[in-house]
Structures are given as structure tokens and as C-alpha cells.
């Protein structure tokens, strides 16, 4: 099983890259992960609602192209309106995916969200939190949660939940 993180944006602060890299390094023995950075649409200084929709559409086309290029993989999209999963639920979903041999493309949309087309094609819509999180922080939180879920599946002492 492989998890590709398709994320819009590529100029992350050093602390984001450091945090992401740490969990990426830790998870590799348990789960093959890869990050695919997709260029964010160029934004106007004071974008209109129509501009925002256009940005989501442009980024959505790039996300779907990256997903299609990989062949067969489930499409999981992070979305504030998605289903919330506990870490244990995520561990179960990943364990099921590993048993079935499913690859996953996990989408972190742009600063203005994801396009309706990407949401329509999603196999899973997942909300990390009801809170609004800074876009760069989501990369770190996502990778930490993947690592935590896989540590549960491998009986690693990292997770000390219930």
C-alpha cells in the first residue's frame, strides 16, 4: 500500500518542512508515503468570489490529473464537511486498505478549499477537525496522524490512547 499526499502549494515555512520530514521519516518502515506538491493558482490581491471559484477549479484540475497519472488509487479528500475519524478509526481504515492492497491519494486542497469536481470524485471525505487550521499546519498534523495510526497497527508504543 502506498499513500500519496497531493497537496496544493510548495513554499512552506521551514518549521512545516521540519515537522513533516520527521514524521515522514518515522512512518516509512510501516507505510510507503510520498508527497506530491501541486502549484497553487496565482491569486489576485483582492479576489472576487468568481476568482476564488476559478482558483479552486484550476487547482482541482491539477489534483485530478495527478490522481489519474498514478493509476488505480482511492481518492481521500480533506474537507471541513467530511467525516471526522478518531485515530483508531483511521488505523482501522488503513489496515483494511493494506489488506486489500489499496493505494490512497490523500488531498490537501488549496487555501480556498477544493473544487466541487474533486469532492464529487472523492471516495472518502475526511475532516481532520472542526477547527480552521492553517494550511501549512495541516501537512504536519496529517503526517503525524498517519504515523500515529500506523503505530497502533504495528503495536508501537507511540500512541498512548485509551
From Swiss-Prot:
Family: Belongs to the RNA methyltransferase RlmH family.
Subunit structure: Homodimer.
Function: Specifically methylates the pseudouridine at position 1915 (m3Psi1915) in 23S rRNA.
InterPro entries: Alpha/beta_knot_MTases (IPR029028), RlmH-like (IPR003742), tRNA_m1G_MTases_N (IPR029026)
Protein name: Ribosomal RNA large subunit methyltransferase H
EC number annotated for this UniProt entry: 2.1.1.177
GO cellular component, one term: cytoplasm
Binding, S-adenosyl-L-methionine: 78, 109, 128-133
Reaction equations catalysed: pseudouridine(1915) in 23S rRNA + S-adenosyl-L-methionine = N(3)-methylpseudouridine(1915) in 23S rRNA + S-adenosyl-L-homocysteine + H(+)
Compartment(s) where it occurs, according to its Swiss-Prot or TrEMBL record: Cytoplasm
A molecular-function term among this protein's GO annotations: rRNA (pseudouridine-N3-)-methyltransferase activity
UniProt keywords, alphabetically: Cytoplasm, Methyltransferase, rRNA processing, S-adenosyl-L-methionine, Transferase
Source organism per UniProt: Psychrobacter arcticus (strain DSM 17307 / VKM B-2377 / 273-4)
HAMAP family linked: 23SrRNA_methyltr_H (MF_00658)
Domain of life of the organism encoding this protein: Bacteria
Amino acid at each position: 500500500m502506498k499513500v500519496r499526499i497531493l497537496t496544493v502549494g510548495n513554499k512552506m515555512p521551514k518549521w512545516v518542512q521540519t515537522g513533516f520530514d520527521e514524521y515522514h521519516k518515522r512512518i516509512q518502515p510501516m507505510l510507503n508515503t510520498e508527497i506530491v506538491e501541486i502549484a497553487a493558482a496565482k491569486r489576485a490581491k483582492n479576489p472576487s468570489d468568481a476568482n476564488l471559484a476559478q482558483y479552486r477549479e484550476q487547482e482541482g484540475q491539477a489534483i485530478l490529473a495527478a490522481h489519474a497519472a498514478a493509476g488505480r488509487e482511492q481518492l481521500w479528500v480533506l474537507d471541513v464537511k467530511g467525516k471526522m475519524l478518531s485515530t483508531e478509526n483511521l488505523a482501522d481504515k488503513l489496515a483494511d486498505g493494506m489488506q486489500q492492497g489499496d493505494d490512497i491519494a490523500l488531498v490537501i486542497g488549496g487555501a480556498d478549499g477544493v473544487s466541487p469536481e474533486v469532492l464529487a470524485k472523492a471516495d472518502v471525505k475526511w475532516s481532520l477537525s472542526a477547527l480552521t487550521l492553517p494550511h501549512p499546519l495541516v501537512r504536519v498534523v496529517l503526517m503525524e496522524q498517519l504515523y500515529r495510526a500506523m503505530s497502533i497497527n504495528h503495536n508501537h508504543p507511540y500512541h498512548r490512547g485509551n
